[in-house]
A protein has these predicted regions:
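Active-site mouth loops of central-metabolism enzymes
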Residues: 140-159, 220-223, 246-248, 299-307
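Short, acidic/polar
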Residues: 152-164, 209, 227, 250, ...
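Extended hydrophobic packing segments that form well-structured cores
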Residues: 396-470
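Hydrophobic faces of well-ordered beta-strands that scaffold small-molecule active sites
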Residues: 55, 74-76, 142-148, 170-174, ...
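Glycine-rich, proline-tolerant flexible connector loops at the mouths of alpha/beta enzymes
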Residues: 169-197
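Conserved anion-binding
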Residues: 102-107, 118-120, 125-129, 135-137, ...
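Catalytic alpha/beta core domains of metabolic enzymes, predominantly
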Residues: 4, 11-22, 76, 237-369
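N-terminal amphipathic alpha-helix/helix-capping segment at the start of soluble metabolic enzymes
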Residues: 1, 86-159, 403-406, 464-470
Length: 470
């Protein structure tokens, strides 16, 4: 297959090295590869016959008309020339996209394939039992249970529950503190009665447990003090239970639950936080004759570290321990996003089932770090100057000063009582420039920096402080 690789002078050597072993012509069409025009490509295709063209993934032009005229398919290559070596071996084995850069396209294809494998494995899995249609145990994927603490105090419980399910929770657990009443429990579950998704109640109070049995699918925290009181009621309701150890052992409490007639039992050996017996508590996660519950959320909430790595590692430990349900929460600001992170982590563990390590799976939990850094070609220049320090004196823009902030998922820039809002920093800056609100170049540079900081704060769920460090 003969390939045409139009490129720029800045990346020519890199592309030539990558294409050396292929039947490919590397042609420089200008200084920058992404500036290739349909006319320039049309002229190249008139000179020689090719089976396909791979243009820079950064090209913004449409080559649809050129393809119609010449019959030669024009595909998007990677956005970065350094990645062309990863794409060329695939030519002829699969069709690249005409509109999406090859690196994005291939990553999406791998992710789609990975998610299909997860879906197929879940479809074929034979569970220990079902909870409102959700498979628990057996060979099914480890299910994510997300907690809402003090559910009776939640302002919009329905939206919160729906949001948790949308984020990836298989089960939403409604916790009720010591100040909750049976009426509180009844009210909360009545607001969710028509939701066709698994809900759990988390309380040790027998009266609160009874109040939840009309809708709850799982009861958490049964042990020797409440099983004698509500065990038969729970059994009659046909709901599943999570049994924990108390003053007696977990094994004895499971036996108590069985004696009461409960059939769907999940064992929770109680995972302890780091520093309070975490390693020792892992020894309790032995093989049980029933599904096992892994309380990862308690560990993450009590660890001042980014949640994404902690959730990934705990999901791996839970998978090795044979857990069927993994608990997570978003109670604190630092754990926001844990539901989505934990769902992805459980999917990674499914894909890692037949591998020695959970890597190169098609999906990952890399957020800030890269799996592999690109080795870009060095910049070419003939002269350089050392940057001078920015002067301490500030020249105020005569048009006025801005206050930058964030509201939900939007960036807000305010001047003279008028706000411009947007989701992308460049859109906000462009609007401010178009309105004539900025007259000094250094003010524009400053605003670009602050607006981008605001966008990053939204993306990563962080606080934003104008003029502060990110």
């Amino acid at each position: 297959m003969r390939i045409l690789l139009p490129t720029g002078a800045a990346t020519e050597s890199l592309v030539r090295r990558a294409a050396a072993e292929y039947d490919a012509d590397v042609v420089v069409t200008g200084e920058i590869a992404s500036f290739l025009t349909p006319h320039a490509l049309r002229m190249l295709l008139k000179k020689k016959k090719y089976d396909c063209v791979i243009v820079s993934g950064m090209c913004t032009a449409s080559f649809e008309q050129v393809e119609r005229e010449t019959g030669v398919p024009v595909y998007r290559g990677p956005r970065h020339a350094a990645d062309i070596a990863l794409v060329l071996p695939l030519i002829g084995t699969m069709e690249l996209s005409r509109t999406v850069p090859a690196d994005d396209f291939l990553a999406a294809r791998k992710a789609e394939s990975a998610l299909r494998r997860i879906e197929e494995q879940e479809k074929d899995a034979i569970p220990d039992f079902l909870i409102r249609g959700v498979k628990i145990g057996g060979g099914s994927r480890m299910k994510v249970l997300a907690e809402i603490m003090d559910a009776h105090r939640c302002g919009d419980i329905r939206s919160t529950v729906e949001g948790y399910h949308a984020s990836g929770a298989d089960i939403v657990d409604l916790g009720f503190g010591f100040d909750a009443t049976p009426d509180d429990v009844t009210r909360v579950f009545s607001l969710l009665a028509d939701l066709d998704a698994p809900l759990a109640v988390d309380t040790q109070d027998p009266s609160l447990i009874r109040a939840a049995l009309g809708r709850a699918d799982i009861v958490l925290s049964l042990q020797e003090t409440n099983i004698p009181e509500v065990g038969k009621d729970v059994a009659m309701a046909g709901v599943a239970v999570v049994v924990v150890p108390g003053n007696t052992t977990l094994t004895k409490n499971i036996a108590l639950a069985k004696k009461a007639g409960v059939r769907c039992i999940i064992a929770d050996p109680l995972l302890q936080p780091v520093g309070s017996g975490f390693t020792r508590s892992l020894s309790g996660f032995r093989k049980f004759s029933c599904p096992v519950f892994f309380g990862a959320g308690n560990v993450v909430e009590l660890l001042d570290a980014d949640s994404v790595g902690a959730n990934a590692l705990l999901a791996g430990i839970a998978a090795e321990a044979g857990a069927s349900i993994i608990f997570t929460s978003e109670h604190s600001d630092k754990t926001r996003g844990s539901i989505r992170e934990m769902r992805r982590a459980t999917e990674m563990m499914v894909l890692a089932g037949n591998r020695p390590y959970p890597k190169d799976l098609g999906i990952d939990l890399l957020v800030l770090k890269e799996k592999r850094r690109r080795r870009e070609p060095p910049l070419e220049y003939t002269a350089s100057a050392t940057a001078r320090p920015m002067p301490d004196e500030i020249t105020c823009d005569p048009r006025g000063n801005f206050r930058i902030g964030i509201e939900g998922d939007r960036i807000v820039a305010v001047i003279h009582g008028k706000a411009v809002t947007g989701k992308r920093w460049q859109d906000v800056l462009y609007t401010l420039l178009s309105q004539g609100d900025i007259s000094l170049p250094d003010h524009a540079g400053y605003l670009g920096r602050e607006l981008y900081k605001a966008e990053l704060a939204i993306r990563y769920g962080r606080s934003f402080e104008q003029d502060g460090e990110f």
